Curated annotation (Swiss-Prot):
It is found in: Cytoplasm. The keyword Cytoplasm applies. Keywords: Cytoplasm, Stress response. The gene is hspQ. This is Heat shock protein HspQ. Involved in the degradation of certain denaturated proteins, including DnaA, during heat shock stress. One of its GO terms (cellular component) is cytoplasm.
């Protein structure tokens, strides 16, 4: 079993670029498409570690869906981001949906 560092609804930062993001899904390993031989790195531990579907904002403040390796993400220490309130709202909405029981007919 592969353990992930981050959970759905958690806010994270891109380690190199510093962008704030919200995790919307987690894959136990890279699963978008099979990489070609040219794309295979010498160390495939990156592909076999968790990968995350993350929503970030572009320069205009529009949401962008990005697929990132766990090694590319860091913890976010601030709970509120006045410069990016929509990401705060998204994270809170996801967390509330995960906590709320669903009604079944």
């Amino acid at each position: 079993m592969i353990a992930s560092k981050f959970g759905i609804g958690q806010q994270v930062r891109h380690k190199l670029l510093g962008y704030l993001g919200v995790i919307i899904d987690v894959d136990p390993e890279y699963s978008l498409e099979k990489p070609s031989l040219d794309d295979i790195a010498a160390d495939d531990s990156l592909r076999t570690a968790p990968w995350y579907h993350v929503v970030m904002e572009d320069e205009e403040g529009k949401p962008v869906h990005i697929y990132l390796a766990e090694a590319q993400l860091g913890y976010e220490s601030f709970p509120v981001h006045p410069e990016q309130p929509t990401l705060d709202e998204l994270a809170e909405s996801i967390r509330l949906q995960l906590q709320a029981p669903r009604l079944r007919n």
